[in-house]
Amino acid sequence: MEPKKILVVEDNVIVAMEIQARLRKAGYLVTGIAATGDAAVQNAATTHPDLLLMDITLKGEMDGIEAVTRIQKEYRPAVIYVTAYSNEEVMTRAMATHPHAYLTKPFEPGELLRQIEEALRLSGNGSMPSLP
């Protein structure tokens, strides 16, 4: 069985590298690290990851929620938001994209891996077909 593909979208390089190392150690294939929404959309279009680990506040014009919205126009990967934001407006916008989970930083690495496993299991073969 091929390893599940995960795109890490995080503008803090140190955090992104730590997440990438943990994911690789757990047997996942990290398709890339994106620091901007534009880079996330481009990476997802070419690699079709099974899951997006998405920060909300990113460098550039597009935040993580908008990036997920654009990616979901093409196909429906599982989504886990990993962010420091927890205000009601941001959470409402994020929940409209139907993520599997919304983890607030700092988070326990074990919890992240549990959420990833559950999201991939619930999404069936890794990614759901695009909605009409």
Which role does the model predict for each range below?
Residues 10:
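Conserved acidic carboxylate
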Residues 13-32:
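Two-component/phosphorelay signaling modules centered on CheY-like receiver
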Residues 20, 33-51:
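Acidic, metal-coordinating helix/loop segments flanking the phosphotransfer/catalytic sites
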Residues 36, 62-66:
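Acidic catalytic/metal-coordinating carboxylates
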Residues 55-56, 83:
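Active-site residues of response regulator receiver
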Residues 65-77:
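Short amphipathic alpha-helix used as the core "switch/output" element in two-component signaling
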Residues 86-104, 114:
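Alpha4 helix (beta4-alpha4-beta5 surface) of REC/receiver domains from two-component response regulators
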Residues 89, 107-117, 124:
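C-terminal output helix
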